[in-house]
Design a protein with these regions (language model features):
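Active-site-proximal loop/hinge segments that shape catalytic or ion-binding/gating pockets
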Residues: 1-135
């Protein structure tokens, strides 16, 4: 929300330039990429860190998928848990991706144009995923 509303110092381009790169845990593992993931925002002191997929159930998946972030009177830890992270060490090869999400059709065309400039590389599908962005 801060990004969308211009509240991030030094950044004023809004959400449109942001793209979501999609893969799966299984694909990351097959590629041999070291990774860690959290059950909430990585800077919170009580966030737990994992490096074994058996612990993926520690993530509050329904909350991660929920459109709303805010803490409630009944649950004062929603905001932290919604910010669970999956981090890949140093980088991820392009071939591990299975999709790219963008804000709108204009950005979809732009990203597809960039990808098509590399015909020797995997042509990752680009989808408009408006639901991943703030309204």
């Amino acid at each position: 929300l801060k990004l969308k509303s211009g509240q991030v110092e030094g950044y004023a381009e809004g959400q449109e330039p942001l793209v979501y790169l999609r893969t799966t845990v299984q694909a990351v593992m097959r590629a041999g990429c070291p990774f860690v993931f959290t059950d909430g925002h990585g800077l919170a002191k009580f966030t737990r860190w994992f490096d074994e997929p058996a612990h993926l159930d520690a993530i509050d998946w329904p909350l991660v998928r929920d459109r709303f972030w805010g803490d409630t009177l009944d649950d004062s830890d929603r905001k932290r848990r919604k910010q669970a992270e999956f981090l890949v060490w140093q980088g991820l090869d392009w071939d591990v991706l299975d999709g790219i999400g963008v804000l709108n059709a204009g950005m979809q065309q732009r990203v597809q144009g960039i990808i098509s400039g590399y015909p020797e590389r995997k042509q990752v599908p680009v989808h408009v995923t408006r639901h991943l962005y703030y309204p």
